[in-house]
A protein has these predicted regions:
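Active-site clefts of carbohydrate-active enzymes
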Residues: 5-7, 214-233, 270-305
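Pro/Thr/Ser/Gly-rich low-complexity, intrinsically disordered linker/stalk tracts
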Residues: 331-386
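Polysaccharide-binding and catalytic clefts of secreted carbohydrate-active enzymes
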Residues: 39-40, 47, 79, 88, ...
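Recognizes extended acidic, P/S/T-rich segments that occur
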Residues: 387-410
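Active-site-adjacent "subsite" loops/lids of carbohydrate-active enzymes
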Residues: 6, 10-25, 83, 93-153, ...
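Aromatic-lined carbohydrate-binding/catalytic grooves of carbohydrate-active enzymes
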Residues: 37-73
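Substrate-binding cleft of secreted/luminal carbohydrate-active enzymes
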Residues: 244-267, 281-353
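The substrate-binding groove and active-site-proximal loops of carbohydrate-active enzymes
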Residues: 10-21, 60-75, 126-144, 185-196, ...
Length: 410
């Protein structure tokens, strides 16, 4: 049960005119509501178009943070949101927009700190927008340095890649020189797909070598490949060179959140196609409640999709974006609350280890001065210094069913 919490342009958070203290209160309110509605995963946008929302030595802090009135104190949004998420039992995944860098005006606003100035050899201008060049191996190194900075310095639960693809206008990206230098005799379409797969592989291998519990995921286009008459025109594989199914088959992704912001014949067959290509790893369709505003979808359009995916071997739902849910557009949350009455367990990364979870040691109830009992326990010895999380269950019966969501309280 995930949401994309969008910081680009302050769409979900933060509002540019607020002080840091007000921004913190606003973010806490969002997280409190997600917890109240029994969500468990926040995809928090930490990088968008060459600027970031954490303390970085590589890229500049977002102007939405540094440009606020009364902002003399140092504020690290990623550190703050991780702490607040974990206090509420929410996972926090660092959402990283990969290749797009923005238009001329945005790039100029970053001055000499823009990657177009610090690393001009790995960028391309396409139309009115700047992009990192996926075909240049040094682009991999640059993006991986950002991932390393985040994973090393922050207790994130996941790294989540967005726009991990070529721009939409197929074949026109100006990479002739890069292809000539690095193409290795491949067809250009295959070479472009291989470029992104190469970066995915490098990143996954590094993350798992450092913090194997950190989930590596991405949000590819919602239609993997053209299926007969369905989905022609804009697909991940054919149009923007995302071979996301291959990433799963190679074991270089833990999860996919395909952006399935379509209806009917452009939705249902593609859910099944993702299942076929998911390699039994975590698959979480991204649903688009924002379409109720932009395209006039009914609430029932979203609910029908939730019904469908919950009957499939799928591991949850994600929603774009937070405000479209929490503002209760067309009373969507009233309906979703019937599905999310109780907390839900997160799927385990069973391909990393098939060991069963260990029990807490020396579980005890201690009575406090106010008469309240506090549960306490010791960390399992098997943790070996790794971060440990717990599920807490409660039942009034002697037999406790851990598969019954009503018994999961924290």
């Amino acid at each position: 049960r995930a949401v994309w919490l969008t910081t680009n342009y302050g769409l979900d958070w933060p509002r540019n005119r607020l002080s840091h203290e007000q921004q913190k209160k606003e973010l806490i309110s969002i997280l409190d509501n997600l917890k109240k509605w029994n969500f468990n995963t926040v995809l928090f946008q930490v990088r968008a178009r060459g600027e970031v929302l954490y303390d970085s030595k590589i890229e500049p802090m977002s102007s939405l943070i540094v440009g606020n009135p009364g902002s003399k104190e140092k504020f690290d949004p990623l550190a703050f949101v991780i702490e607040e998420c974990h206090q509420r039992g929410l996972e926090c995944h660092a959402w990283v927009v990969t290749y797009p860098l923005g238009g001329d005006k945005h790039v100029r606003s970053l001055g000499r700190s823009s990657v177009t100035k610090t690393n001009p050899n790995i960028v391309k201008k396409f139309g009115n927008e700047w992009y990192l060049d996926p075909g240049n191996p040094r682009t991999d190194d640059y993006l991986l340095s950002i991932v390393k900075e985040i994973v090393t310095n922050y207790d994130v639960d996941g790294i989540h890649f967005d726009y991990i693809r070529y721009p939409d206008n197929r074949g026109r990206f100006p990479d002739d020189d890069t292809f000539k230098k690095h193409g290795k005799g491949m067809k250009r379409d295959d070479w472009r797909r291989d470029n992104i797969t190469r970066f995915v592989t490098k990143t996954y291998d590094w993350v798992k070598s450092e913090k194997p519990w950190v989930t590596v995921s991405s949000s590819p286009l919602g239609r993997y490949r053209a299926l007969g008459r369905n989905g022609n025109g804009w697909t991940a594989y054919e149009t923007v060179y995302q071979d996301a199914g291959k990433w799963m088959q190679l074991g270089k992704h833990d999860a996919l959140f395909p952006m399935m912001y379509y209806k009917e014949h452009l939705f249902y067959p593609f859910v099944d196609d993702w299942i076929e290509n998911g390699n039994n790893r975590i698959l979480v369709p991204g649903l688009g409640p924002y379409q109720m505003i932009e395209l006039g979808w009914s609430k029932q359009d979203i609910i029908n999709q939730v019904d469908y995916v919950r009957k499939k071997p799928i591991h949850g739902q994600a929603y774009f974006r937070a405000d479209n849910l929490l503002s209760n557009t067309k009373e969507i949350m009233n309906s979703l609350s019937e599905y999310y009455q109780f907390p839900a367990k997160l799927p385990a990364l069973t391909w990393l280890s098939d060991e069963k979870p260990t029990e807490a040691i020396d579980l005890r109830a201690e009575k406090q001065d106010d008469g309240i009992f506090t549960l306490k326990w010791d960390e399992p010895k098997e943790s070996n210094g790794n971060r440990v999380t717990y599920n807490v269950y409660r039942s009034e019966d002697e037999e406790l069913d851990i598969n019954d969501g009503q018994n999961l309280i924290a």
